[in-house]
Amino acid sequence: DRTIEAVELLQLPAPKFENSDNAFKVFIYTYKPFEQLTTQEKLRALYQHVTLLFIQQDFATNETLRLRFGLGEKKASLISKLVASAKESRLIKNFDPSSESKRYVKYVPVWA
């Protein structure tokens, strides 16, 4: 989790982890603006952000995700679309599915 914290602090693309027979590899990438990240990179960063906050006994929100990606409020729709894609891909879910609020939704990993 220290790696993910450092990556988030610097707003770097999410690291990629690979496990092979004889080695465990971590790929750390240099900074890229949100617009240059691939969909997979965005989803990986979103998932790692949600998971990191969950293990810290906190919740991800649209606001924390905007901060993670270095986006202002004017680009909130980009985060909303990414969240919808992450839910569709079964990476995350709403913490409280019965909540009607769209503005203050809290997200957790789908396995939580």
Model-derived segments and their meaning:
Residues 1-112:
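C-terminal regulatory or interaction extensions
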